A protein has these predicted regions:
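The first (N-terminal) embedded transmembrane alpha-helix
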Residues: 294-317, 370-373, 432-440
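Extended hydrophobic alpha-helices typical of membrane-associated regions
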Residues: 356, 421-422, 527-577
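The feature marks the mature, well-folded catalytic cores of soluble enzymes
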Residues: 1-258, 262-265, 271, 275-279
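Transmembrane alpha-helical segments that form the membrane-embedded catalytic/substrate-channel core
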Residues: 332-344, 395-410, 438, 462-477, ...
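Short juxtamembrane and helix-loop transition motifs at transmembrane-helix boundaries
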Residues: 287-294, 351-361, 417-420, 486-495, ...
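Intramembrane alpha-helical segments
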Residues: 358-447, 541-550
């Protein structure tokens, strides 16, 4: 079944910030931590936080010591004052958009204005906003309630940040008709507006809409309401288990969106479950092709064959005579390391890629055995190439295995917070890129050949740069799961925006280096052709940034496809040069 996923389906800025603050604090493991009220309205996320030792309290007397986090919805000023006087360490995770509305209300009510808040009376955000009204605030939730606003000279309007934009506009018109001098403020969050617009854009494009989010989440329920009012068959689900597969099976294209407090892994689970539903029009052959491709991707065979293709391209770039031994060595080593490290580090994949985690559980024996025999095969091939290469591959294999294993004794961990190599911030991306570069470009220098060092070094830098970009891009896709388990990958250390900026610079520098090497005759003119690989990676970055594709099977396959592009260019160069 085809799925059209909304570009805006993910945590909003405020929820993401609150989650990052809480998880970062929880991963430090320094004392107890609680949130003052549920951090966000999503049962699965709250359960996750509880598994990390983060509890939720509603009364300050329930918490005596430790760190207390103010929820994303914000709280009234009298509660904030009480928390400050409690002596507890406070972390303010109030959404910045909510804080702006609080400031508007506080400022104008002090000037003698009466605040009209358009929102849900019982919602925590609205309760907090009322507290800033200095006794001069009223809440309304419909056009009918405009007539109940007390007569007053100075009025201003604000909205709960997750309100329906069209409804707010209608209420503004009604209030302006009664209070012509009323001040109005656009306080609905951009993320909320964009989600609502995208729901309406589904009209005529999809057969039905699935909205993923908590049953008690106000903004999620509003998306459901907007979808229903647009005349679209609408299904509100919390998890993939809530899907009505029987009804969905009669449809062809399903639109999927999610509330602002719905994490990526829940959206992925729902999307994958919908995609797995067989429609009446789907052919056996088409389904077989799709399943075969997915098997290649989930089993890491796709990235391994990508390594094969990249090794062939690197041999042509460095001036070596292309053969099958070196690409096969790369294929076997890369497959073994990816598979075995998946089993050694299962935590983050549960959240980053639930489908792959499930695949690994189902095919555990096959994958472990195939990974083990791939390593044996890599060692056998390396021995054929010489004892020096054999020991080099053995060393790389040992480093690859211990990457995910604790190497610092428990008794010494109080002196050094990183017990594993992978715990070192940013080490994952760097380690993968170095391993690929050494394996594909530098190991051949240990063989008794007349390979030129400058060409080999350039080949190493080419492989290192594109593998680094690939690994960092996957780290961006997987940031939520890594944050949950406490892995400090590059995007967590630098932030997504800076990481993407860094990747663009790496692509630019790599392209300039290839061009310079071709101009100075360090390598042959084939390097001009490889500029297409950097262009293709740039396209992948743009596709992600513009949200033309959501992180998932198709985008991952597109990223991995860059290695095959390099191999194809090398093959074409051999044929036609």
């Amino acid at each position: 079944m085809k799925v059209r996923l909304a570009k805006t389906a993910a945590f909003c800025m405020g929820v993401r910030r609150a989650m990052e603050m809480v998880l970062t604090e929880a991963n430090k493991g320094k004392g107890s931590i609680s949130t003052f009220g549920p951090l966000i309205h999503n049962k699965q996320v709250i359960d996750l936080l509880e598994s990390k030792g983060v509890t939720s309290i509603n009364d300050i007397d329930e918490f005596n010591e430790g760190t207390l986090v103010i929820r994303a919805h914000g709280i009234p000023p009298d509660q904030r004052k009480a928390l400050r006087e409690s002596g507890l360490r406070l972390i303010d995770a109030t959404c910045r958009r909510v804080a702006r509305v609080q400031s508007i209300i506080r400022y104008h009510t002090k000037k003698g204005y009466t605040a009209i808040i358009v929102g849900d009376r019982d919602h925590p955000e609205v309760i907090g906003l009322l507290g800033y009204g200095n006794g001069r605030a009223h809440v309304i939730n419909s056009l009918e309630e405009v007539s109940r606003i007390p007569d007053t000279e100075k009025v201003f309007l604000v909205a709960q940040t997750t309100q329906d934009e069209e409804k707010y506009r209608d209420i503004i018109e009604a209030v302006m008709a009664r209070f012509p001098d009323a001040l109005t403020f656009d306080t609905i969050c951009d993320a909320t507006i964009n989600r609502q617009k995208e729901i309406r854009s589904f009209i005529g494009q999809v057969d039905a809409v699935v909205v993923v989010g908590g049953y008690h989440s106000g903004n999620t329920k509003r998306l459901v309401q907007i979808s229903q009012e647009a005349g679209l068959p609408t299904f509100h689900v919390e998890t993939e288990k809530d899907l009505d597969k029987e009804r969905l099976s009669s449809m062809e294209v399903i639109g999927v969106t999610a509330g602002a407090s719905t994490p990526n892994w829940m959206i992925k689970n729902v999307v994958q479950e919908i995609e797995a539903i067989r429609t009446r029009q789907e052919t056996f052959f088409g389904r077989w092709i799709k399943n075969a491709f997915k098997f290649m991707l989930l089993s890491n065979l796709l990235v391994a064959f990508g390594g094969f293709a990249l090794a062939h391209a690197a041999s042509v770039l460095s001036g070596r005579t292309p053969d099958l031994i070196h690409p096969c060595l790369a294929l076997l080593y890369i497959y073994a390391m990816h598979v075995l490290n998946r089993f050694l580090d299962k935590g983050a994949s549960t959240y980053n890629d639930p489908e792959r985690a499930s695949f690994y559980r189902r095919h555990r024996v096959f994958l472990i055995l195939s990974g083990f025999f791939s390593m044996i095969g890599a060692l056998a091939l390396s021995y054929y190439l010489g004892t020096t290469i054999f020991f080099a591959i053995a060393g790389l294999s040992i480093l690859g295995i211990i990457y995910s294993l604790p190497i610092v004794p428990v008794s010494l961990r109080h002196l050094w917070r990183y017990s594993k190599i992978k715990d070192i911030p940013g080490s994952k991306t760097l380690s993968v890129a170095l391993a690929w570069g050494v394996l594909i470009s530098l190991l051949p220098l240990l063989e008794p050949t007349s390979l030129a060092w400058p060409a080999a070094i350039l080949s190493f830098l080419f492989v290192f740069s594109i593998v680094y970009v690939r690994s960092a891009l996957f780290d961006i896709f997987q940031v939520q799961g890594d944050l949950i388990v406490g892995v400090e990958t590059l995007p967590i250390v630098l932030g997504e925006k800076r990481t993407l900026h860094l990747l663009k610079w790496i692509i630019l520098c790599g392209a300039l280096l290839l061009s310079l090497a071709a101009l100075t005759k360090v390598v042959g003119p084939f390097s001009w052709l490889l500029l297409l690989v950097f262009f293709s990676f740039t396209l992948c970055l743009i596709i992600y940034q513009k949200r033309w594709l959501y992180p998932g099977t198709r985008l991952e396959a597109m990223v991995e496809g860059n290695f095959f592009l390099a191999g194809l260019l090398a093959l074409l160069w051999q044929i036609f040069s």
